[in-house]
């Protein structure tokens, strides 16, 4: 459950460390984003010589949340923190070339197959 002003970790090697959600995309008064939703973010903390820098405004897809994901069989998959993968603003393809940590099966849509293939573990 990600909303505006939520701080997230970054689960790729784009160079960003911490980002803040500034808008949940999809719908005019949409309040929350879950796993697989696209959000607009600004970079709050970045490493030197990364692909992105502090202050950049980009899109990102949420890959892990503390709230978790409920499956049709009733099971819930939760994580220790909120994490996202940065996307190119135009093509919505990942900026990084590696993904760190597990991602959920809910990302298996046409748009995010690249993230699924880069992830070390799909839950």
Swiss-Prot record:
PROSITE patterns: RIBOSOMAL_L14 (PS00049). It comes from the Bacteria. GO terms for cellular component: cytoplasm; cytosol; cytosolic large ribosomal subunit. One of its GO terms (molecular function) is large ribosomal subunit rRNA binding. Changing residue 98 to A: Reduced RsfS binding. One of its GO terms (biological process) is cytoplasmic translation. The keyword rRNA-binding applies. The keyword Metal-binding does not apply. Keywords: Ribonucleoprotein, Ribosomal protein, RNA-binding, rRNA-binding. Gene3D superfamilies: Ribosomal protein L14 (2.40.150.20). Binds to 23S rRNA. Forms part of two intersubunit bridges in the 70S ribosome. Belongs to the universal ribosomal protein uL14 family. Part of the 50S ribosomal subunit. Forms a cluster with proteins L3 and L19. Forms two bridges to the 30S subunit in the 70S ribosome, contacting the 16S rRNA. In pre-50S ribosomal subunits interacts with RsfS, which may inhibit association with the 30S subunit. This is Large ribosomal subunit protein uL14. It comes from Escherichia coli (strain K12). The gene is rplN.
């Amino acid at each position: 459950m990600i909303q505006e002003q939520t701080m997230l970790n970054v689960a790729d090697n784009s160079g960003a460390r911490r980002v803040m959600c500034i808008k949940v995309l999809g719908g005019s008064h949409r309040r929350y984003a879950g796993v697989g939703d696209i959000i607009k973010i600004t970079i709050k903390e970045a490493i030197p010589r990364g692909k992105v820098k502090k202050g950049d405004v980009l899109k990102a897809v949420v890959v892990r949340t503390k709230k978790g994901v409920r499956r049709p069989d009733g099971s819930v998959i939760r994580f220790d923190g909120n994490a996202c993968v940065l996307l190119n603003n135009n093509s919505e393809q990942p900026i990084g070339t590696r993904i760190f940590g597990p991602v959920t099966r809910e990302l298996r849509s046409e748009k995010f197959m690249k993230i699924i293939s880069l992830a070390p573990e799909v839950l």
